[in-house]
């Protein structure tokens, strides 16, 4: 029931990765990357499908060899989500996956080789309407830039990115997006800020090598949150040393927290104290797991007592306020019922699913009326 965030998005050029629009006000796309051996087709397909189930808009796959390129062909045939092929050094791999229907090429023109090889890749991408992502990383800056700046700096990342941008400009190719990633939050944020002022291309956000699930999520939330709150960013990846599925979940949580893009349940829950009248923590944990399949945007407040419960419930789609033996249930800010504290999880799950059905039907009818 909260209003969308008053964030003014940076104006950027529209490109498409498969059927997913990127830039020019399109919803910010959330993506991840497989960590299986690409030559293990079954494992890679299974992981991509798992990412699809939790809402991944785009999935990146590393293609380091020709054998991996042949595997990519089989993988592409078995999944629906757009795939980005991560290519380094061998331009022939880029040409091969383009032949096999890749939706986007992630390259650095600087490590593909000669001008002729870069032109071959760009010409192929143009002919097949395949966009390119220029991926600059603080950990792999060009040697001359390392010597010039002494260490990765925002100016160094910007200069590296602009070299590659200029290269594509000279080849009259404008279907690309750019990233300037670093593991240091401030370095990444300032690099993106500088780049956003220089070009109109879509920007892919990320804090690279952020760390494990907990620390990496925190770093990404801070770094990406700063940029997104300033209107910078058209697609993002939360890079975690964890199951890639978690990257998608955290990515959507960041967007939900900023009210930029809603997907699924946004739980508002108190940290609990001695006033709680039911097991808030157990209830929230159980419902997060049970309701992972729901994609209907909805705010659900679960508060253990009457201090803050009624106030949160007023601005939630559904809200529970802890009470003695039974807790108050609010719907769209109005108290509707009381739930038995001993059966809270099952009852609340049923109410949330029922509300999701109602909201989905209302959305369907609204779309039909607009299309008439």
Curated annotation (Swiss-Prot):
Pathway: Isoprenoid biosynthesis; isopentenyl diphosphate biosynthesis via DXP pathway; isopentenyl diphosphate from 1-deoxy-D-xylulose 5-phosphate: step 5/6. It comes from the Bacteria. Its cofactor is [4Fe-4S] cluster. InterPro entries: Dihydropteroate_synth-like_sf, IspG_bac, IspG_bac-typ, NO2/SO3_Rdtase_4Fe4S_sf. [4Fe-4S] cluster binds at residues 270, 273, 305, 312. It catalyses: (2E)-4-hydroxy-3-methylbut-2-enyl diphosphate + oxidized [flavodoxin] + H2O + 2 H(+) = 2-C-methyl-D-erythritol 2,4-cyclic diphosphate + reduced [flavodoxin]. Binds 1 [4Fe-4S] cluster. One of its GO terms (biological process) is isopentenyl diphosphate biosynthetic process, methylerythritol 4-phosphate pathway. GO terms for molecular function: 4 iron, 4 sulfur cluster binding; 4-hydroxy-3-methylbut-2-en-1-yl diphosphate synthase activity (ferredoxin); 4-hydroxy-3-methylbut-2-enyl-diphosphate synthase activity (flavodoxin); iron ion binding. Keywords: 4Fe-4S, Iron, Iron-sulfur, Isoprene biosynthesis, Metal-binding, Oxidoreductase. Its EC number is 1.17.7.3. It is an enzyme of class 1 (oxidoreductase). Pfam families: GcpE. Converts 2C-methyl-D-erythritol 2,4-cyclodiphosphate (ME-2,4cPP) into 1-hydroxy-2-methyl-2-(E)-butenyl 4-diphosphate. Belongs to the IspG family. HAMAP family: IspG (MF_00159). This is 4-hydroxy-3-methylbut-2-en-1-yl diphosphate synthase (flavodoxin). It comes from Enterobacter sp. (strain 638). The gene is ispG.
């Amino acid at each position: 029931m909260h209003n969308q965030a008053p964030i003014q998005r940076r104006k950027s050029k529209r490109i498409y990765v498969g059927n997913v629009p990127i830039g020019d006000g399109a919803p910010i796309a959330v993506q991840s990357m497989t960590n299986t051996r690409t030559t293990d087709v079954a494992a890679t397909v299974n992981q991509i499908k798992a990412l699809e189930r939790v809402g991944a808009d785009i999935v990146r796959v590393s293609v380091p060899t020709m054998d991996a390129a042949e595997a990519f062909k089989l993988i592409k045939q078995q999944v629906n989500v757009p795939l980005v092929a991560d290519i380094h050094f061998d331009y022939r791999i880029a040409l091969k996956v383009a032949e096999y229907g890749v939706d986007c090429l992630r390259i650095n023109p600087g490590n593909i080789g000669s001008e002729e090889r870069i032109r071959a890749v760009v010409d192929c991408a143009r002919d097949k309407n395949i966009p390119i992502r220029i991926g600059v990383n603080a950990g792999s800056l060009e040697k001359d830039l390392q010597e010039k700046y002494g260490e990765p700096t925002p100016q160094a990342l910007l200069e590296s990115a602009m070299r590659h941008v200029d290269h594509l400009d000279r080849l009259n190719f404008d279907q690309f997006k750019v990233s300037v990633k670093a593991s240091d939050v401030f370095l990444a944020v300032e690099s993106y800020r500088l780049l956003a002022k220089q070009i109109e291309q879509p920007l892919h956000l990320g804090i690279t090598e952020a760390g494990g699930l907990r620390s990496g999520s925190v770093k990404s939330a801070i770094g990406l949150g700063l940029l997104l709150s300033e209107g910078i960013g058209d697609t993002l990846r939360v890079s975690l040393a964890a199951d890639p599925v978690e990257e998608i979940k955290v990515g959507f949580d960041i967007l939900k927290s900023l009210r930029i893009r809603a997907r699924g349940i946004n739980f508002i829950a108190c940290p609990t104290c001695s006033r709680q009248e039911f097991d808030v923590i157990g209830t929230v944990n159980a419902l997060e797991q049970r309701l992972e399949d729901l994609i209907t945007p909805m705010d659900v407040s679960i508060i253990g007592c009457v201090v803050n419960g009624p106030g949160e419930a007023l601005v939630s789609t559904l809200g529970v306020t802890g009470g003695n033996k039974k807790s108050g249930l609010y719907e769209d800010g109005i108290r509707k019922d009381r739930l038995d504290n001993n059966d809270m999880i099952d009852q609340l799950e049923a109410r949330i699913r029922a509300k999701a059905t109602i909201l989905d039907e209302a959305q369907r009818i609204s779309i039909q009326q607009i299309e008439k």
